[in-house]
Swiss-Prot record:
It catalyses: a ubiquinone + n Na(+)(in) + NADH + H(+) = a ubiquinol + n Na(+)(out) + NAD(+). GO terms for cellular component: Gram-negative-bacterium-type cell wall; plasma membrane. It holds the Pfam family Rnf-Nqr. It comes from Neisseria meningitidis serogroup A / serotype 4A (strain DSM 15465 / Z2491). Disulfide bonds: none annotated. Its EC number is 7.2.1.1. It is a multi-pass membrane protein. This is Na(+)-translocating NADH-quinone reductase subunit E.
Length: 197
C-alpha cells in the first residue's frame, strides 16, 4: 500500500506531466484561460489517462515475447496499439460529452479530439511501458498523472484569470505572460524533485 501511495504522490507532484516533463503544453496553454474550461479538460484528461494507462498495460503484456505464442515478440507494435487504445477512449469520451455535457463539449472545441495526440497521454503510457509497471501500478500512475496535469492546468487558469486585471507590459500580454507564469509554476514544482519516495 505504501508503494502505491508513494507512486501516486510521485506522479502528481514530483513527476508532474505538465510542469516537470513539459508534456501536453499545447492544450495546457490554450485551454488555461478560464478555470471552468480548464477543470473540464482536466477531468477529461484524468478519465483518458486513468483508463488508457491500465488498458495499454494489459495490451502491452499481450505483446511481450511469448505472451500469446511462444517465440513471437510483438513489442514492435506497442506504439500503434497505444495510439489505437487512446484514440478509442477519446472517442468514447467525446460522444459522452456531446450527449450529456454539451456546454463543456462546445467550450473545449477542437482541444477535445486533440487529447488523442496529447503528448502527456502518450508520455504517461510510454513511461508505464518503460518502467514496466504492473496493472495495479498502472492504475495508480494513470490516475495520478491525470490528476497532476489537471492540478497544473487549473492552477494556471486561476493565475491567468487574475492576470486579466493586472497591468502587464504590452509585449507580454496574452501567451507571453502565461509562459512566464507556467515557468514560475514549473520552478515551484522543481522543489518537489528532491523528495525521494
Amino acid at each position: 500500500m505504501e508503494h502505491y501511495l508513494s507512486l501516486f504522490i510521485k506522479s502528481v507532484f514530483i513527476e508532474n506531466m505538465a510542469l516537470s516533463f513539459f508534456l501536453g503544453m499545447c492544450t495546457f496553454l490554450a485551454v488555461s484561460k478560464k478555470v471552468s474550461t480548464a477543470f473540464g479538460l482536466g477531468v477529461a484528461v484524468i478519465f483518458v489517462l486513468g483508463l488508457s494507462v491500465p488498458a495499454n498495460q494489459l495490451v502491452y503484456s499481450l505483446l511481450k515475447d511469448g505472451a500469446i505464442v511462444e517465440g513471437v515478440d510483438l513489442t514492435f507494435l506497442k506504439f500503434i496499439t497505444f495510439i489505437g487504445v487512446i484514440a478509442a477512449l477519446v472517442q468514447i469520451l467525446e460522444m459522452f460529452l456531446d450527449k450529456f455535457v454539451p456546454a463543456l463539449y462546445n467550450a473545449l472545441g477542437i482541444y477535445l479530439p486533440l487529447i488523442t495526440v496529447n503528448c502527456a497521454i502518450f508520455g504517461a503510457v510510454s513511461f508505464m511501458a518503460q518502467r514496466e509497471y504492473g496493472f495495479g501500478e498502472s492504475v495508480v500512475y494513470g490516475f495520478g498523472a491525470g490528476l497532476g496535469w489537471m492540478l497544473a492546468i487549473v492552477a494556471l487558469a486561476g493565475i491567468t484569470e487574475k492576470m486579466k486585471y493586472s497591468d502587464a507590459p504590452k509585449g507580454l500580454k496574452g501567451l507571453g505572460i502565461t509562459f512566464i507564469a507556467a515557468g514560475l509554476m514549473a520552478m515551484a514544482f522543481m522543489s518537489f524533485s528532491g523528495i525521494q519516495l
